[in-house]
Amino acid sequence: MALKIRLSRGGAKKRPFYKIVVADARAPRDGRFIEKVGTYNPMLPNDNGQRWILDEDRVKHWLSVGAQPTDRLVRFFADKGLVAKPVRAEQTKQPQPKAKAQQRAKDQAERDAAAAAEAAAGE
């Protein structure tokens, strides 16, 4: 049985409240779970101690027997020191312009440098 540590939504409309639960990966998000290990109340301010309540011993136990936390909980557990902080891969290609645009920018920079040199020599 594949186990997940995930958030199960509760609360009213526009007033979310989450239970941190250990559940079978095939179970519905808000459905049957094995154990409740904490709560998360996003309506409270970030510095409030009641925003995240966690039974760290039980989380460590479930992680040791192979339960996989969701991405959101991995970030939270990393802040608490329960798991290693996930490594984010750098995006190397996406932010760079295409080759033609890079060539155009390089040519424009050369023209600007030549114009600046001419202006400096003319003074």
UniProtKB/Swiss-Prot annotation:
The keyword Isomerase does not apply. PROSITE patterns: RIBOSOMAL_S16. Residues 86-123 are annotated as: Disordered. Transmembrane segments: none annotated. InterPro entries: Ribosomal_bS16 (IPR000307), Ribosomal_bS16_CS (IPR020592), Ribosomal_bS16_dom_sf (IPR023803). It comes from Paramagnetospirillum magneticum (strain ATCC 700264 / AMB-1) (Magnetospirillum magneticum). One of its GO terms (molecular function) is structural constituent of ribosome. Belongs to the bacterial ribosomal protein bS16 family. Residues 93-102, 114-123 have a biased composition (Low complexity). Residues 104-113 have a biased composition (Basic and acidic residues). One of its GO terms (biological process) is translation. One of its GO terms (cellular component) is small ribosomal subunit. Keywords: Ribonucleoprotein, Ribosomal protein. HAMAP family: Ribosomal_bS16. PANTHER family: 30S RIBOSOMAL PROTEIN S16, SMALL RIBOSOMAL SUBUNIT PROTEIN BS16M. Pfam families: Ribosomal_S16. This is Small ribosomal subunit protein bS16. The keyword Ribonucleoprotein applies.
